[in-house]
Amino acid sequence: MAKLKDMKLDILAFGAHPDDVELGCSGTIAKEISLGKKVGIIDLTRGELGTRGTVEIRNTEATKAAEILGVSVRENLDMRDGFFVNDETHQLEIIKMIRKYQPEIVLCNAIQDRHIDHGKGSKLVSDACFLSGLIQIKTEINGEAQRPWRPKVVYHYIQWQTIEPDFVVDISQFIDMKMKAVQAYSSQFYDPKSNEPVTPIASKNFLESIQYRAKDLGRLVGVEYAEGFTVERYVTVNSLGDLK
């Protein structure tokens, strides 16, 4: 099992589409990597139903964004954009990734959002995290049996829809890296020279709104920029001094 141990990550972030993770929690990812944590990203789909760009372009953009953030690994599960479901087949694909990388923390899509894939992806990953710890569920990769593994916690980042966070992470020193990673997806966002249709995320003020939300969350906790998360169960601290 040494091979699996070598692949162990501290944090594994899932997104229904390439760019979900960057938009929702890339500041936090950059911060954790700077602290020595190993982080990976798993995209569920290629975003093939997106109005702008192509699958090939988005693949290149996802690779560029991963390099900017410095993540250890990025994979895509090739689920059907818009039509993946929360069933055994899809759960097993997630379980294989969880057991392969054995993360302590999983980050995933918002619990509900404008895009239906976000809520679906959120529940799919959350359910798979629980099931991954059950010894009677057997999986293997490349002919090698996998051990059960259940992440300690699952946190949901916030996307289009405004959701009250349960906690926030100070990303003041990493807002520039976050925006650089987001802007790696140039096919998806505002370009005055583009002849492609204008979409909600390709509107002129969208990138400004991403930075504004981070600034507003930061304002509420006395820092310059922050990202918010929701939790599935109570968060434990060792002492009141851990809270700010």
PLM regions: where:
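Active-site rim/loop-helix segments in enzyme catalytic domains that contact anionic ligands
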Residues: 1-101, 230, 240-242
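Metal-dependent de-N-acetylase/amidase catalytic core
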Residues: 2-12, 88-244
